[in-house]
Amino acid sequence: MGAQSKYAQQLNNERSLAPFIPFRSQVGPTTVITRDGDFVRTWRIAGLAFETQDKEKLLIRKDQLNTLFRAIASNNVALWSHNVRRRTWDHLKSFFSNPFCDALDKKYYGSFSGYRMMSNELYLTVIYRPVPAKISRLFNVAVHRSHAEILQEQQLAIRKLDEIGNQIETSLRRYGGDDGRGIEVLSTYEDKHGALCSQQLEFYNFLLSGEWQKVRVPSCPLDEYLGTGWVYAGTETIEIRTANATRYARGIDFKDYANHTEPGILNGLMYSDYEYVITQSFSFMTKRDGKEFLTRQKQRLQNTEDGSASQIMEMDIAIDQLGRGDFVMGEYHYSLLVFAEDMETVRHNTSHAMNILQDNGFLATVIATATDAAFYAQLPCNWRYRPRVAGLTSLNFAGLSCFHNFRAGKRDGNPWGQALTLLKTPSGQPAYLNFHYSKGDEDNFDKKLLGNTRIIGQSGAGKTVLMNFCLAQAQKYLHNAPMGMCNVFFDKDQGAKGTILAIGGKYLAIRNGEPTGFNPFQMEPTAGNILFLEKLVQVLVSRDGQHVTTTDESRISHAIRTVMRMRPELRRLSTVLQNVTEGSDRQDRENSVAKRLAKWCFDDGTGKRGTFWWVLDCPQDQIDFNTHSNYGFDGTDFLDNADVRTPISMYLLHRMELAIDGRRFIYWMDEAWKWVDDEAFSEFANNKQLTIRKQNGLGVFATQMPSSLLNSKVASALVQQVATEIYLPNPKADYHEYTDGFKVTNEEFDIIRSMSEESRMFLVKQGHHSMICRLELNGFDDELAILSGSSDNNELLDQVIAEVGDDPSVWLPVFQERRKARIASSKSTGR
């Protein structure tokens, strides 16, 4: 070699990798055969999301895994499992026509720069050994066999491997999402050039080189083909060189084991910020060999007087359990190879990993003897290179290799395309947030699936920011939407005002006594709209418990149909009043429709304004979903006004219903319980929760008062008809509200209560699976001034827009400048 490593003196010279590679050829799409005639197959396992799983369920899964191992146990069978933690990177594709959304998106994904995004990948390899004993192998090789006999034996072995594989796939398919696709066999495939490639060989090559790359199925022996790097082994350190990089690795194994191996005992490593490969192998013993091993262990304890009476008794119990078939015995080995780009970092990472292992009761040590052997023992079938082989029960193995992983959500193939956004997690695993819940690797694009989402979070936990951030990110779904997209936000305390206006939307704060900007009679004069107007006016004239007669209905209908034939600028409630005929007798006139309707009109017929004219009798209607695709309505005032709440709700919901026409549609409700307290909204929410998915829409509901939501008129619909649940930290969470009301598990409830309110973490749940995510917006002061919806910023925003207009590209810079000046002035005053 020309260039010498900085540490070349302490590293051995280069050696060919071929002697250390046991594989000979690929004999089928999913099967590799070794030089010794063993048949090898590997699966990728999604893994069991352990972070939010109840401990009892994890123990059940461990027992089920032990049952699987017992079912496939034979001295012809061995297992290799791998946990690969590696650095990854991702960025969701987004296109925003709105400058605020575009800038927020770019800055948000820019904040991932320097962030250690990691992924954990789990693999299980099964080896079927037709002739497991070494002497038998030599005898088998010595016997001359015809090509037909060899082929027949190979087919028999593959069939046996198929049987074992079917058992494994049946048992482990639940180790992933709800779709039963938790396991996937590594197979051959054709690349775009038509060349046959192998995922299985790519994995084995990764174990040798540390790099993922396409590997074609060769015609030459695999041991001469695999391995695209150079491996140098020193006393404690291995250097791996490839054409792209040089990396260093150090190995760790166990000198002694923890007393108990509950499932997930090694999970602490999965939160580390460095790359590693954990390799574990388990070669099944016969029952006789297993019993002999345990008996020898018992005798050793007795002879050396190292064992206590309880330890000897435990050995007796183990021998009895083995005899009953509670577990099987096997030869086990463990190695952890930690990687880094330089020697100093790999030492630091190794020290960190050892501390984690020792904290869990293992006596871990750096591999200093035959370090290359530990490296090559990563490859399945390399029995002779395994360091520190120990006898272990299948129950212990099920605890050590329990296939735990993190939930990640679904990146692609969602009903509206890619995931809504990418979130950070405690483990570094990328988490993909979606409204819709769609299963596994299915391509559900344009499918009408349930997407209703519920957000629960107490004041100060970040609920408003999260909702507004999701609203801004959802604007990307407008791009390439065949029929467009619309968002309607039913707000409380104007929390979404800044965001709605910044994304180019229209925001109407409905205040008691002030014109709402609503004029229902300027809608298109369609049959459906006219029927709605008739119903609306009937509600107006019956608000005081007044009865609407058949004659009243006829007069209302006549007046409305007359007005709706006029030009739009003439159509309004006052004009309807002018066209309502009164009765002939005095009693009828005193309680006429006209007199009851007058209080809702700008002109009550005598030149005076009615008490509630400001509600629905404005000269120009301000709602037009053709000019704005985002609307916000603040209900803080009117939701507590029983006189006007229902008519306003009816009109808002009718206009929204007209916009639900197949375009992508989201309606948002902050403090949803307050909105659905009105009869019109409760009826709408109850129906729409069930049907809106068929219309390509969804609802997002939020509250900081779970009890109010659970006690609402439509609680069952708001709880049951939900695809995605988001729970922000709440140290005061009520157990019964969350577990009985929202059906979170005990473990999920504990997480919700224990998360720090300042952590910006939250729990996302879809189906029976959940994950812990974090929306990190450090350094986003300008954006948070919009997303947080604070009262002082809203007041400033109103002032700026009144001066410079409602174009976000104009008012946003002025708003930020004045906001910062206000903060600076406040600081100087406080000094």
Swiss-Prot record:
Gene Ontology MF term list: ATP binding
Entry-linked Pfam families: CagE_TrbE_VirB, P-loop_TraG
Keywords in alphabetical order: ATP-binding, Nucleotide-binding, Virulence
The organism's place on the tree of life at top rank: Bacteria
Protein residues bound to ATP: 457-464
Signal peptide: none
Biological role: The virB operon is essential for intracellular survival and is not involved in the invasion process. Constitutes a major determinant of virulence in mice.
Other remarks on this protein: Transcription is turned on at the beginning of the stationary phase of vegetative growth.
Protein family per UniProt: Belongs to the TrbE/VirB4 family.
Protein name: Type IV secretion system protein virB4
Source species taxonomy: Bacteria, Pseudomonadati, Pseudomonadota, Alphaproteobacteria, Hyphomicrobiales
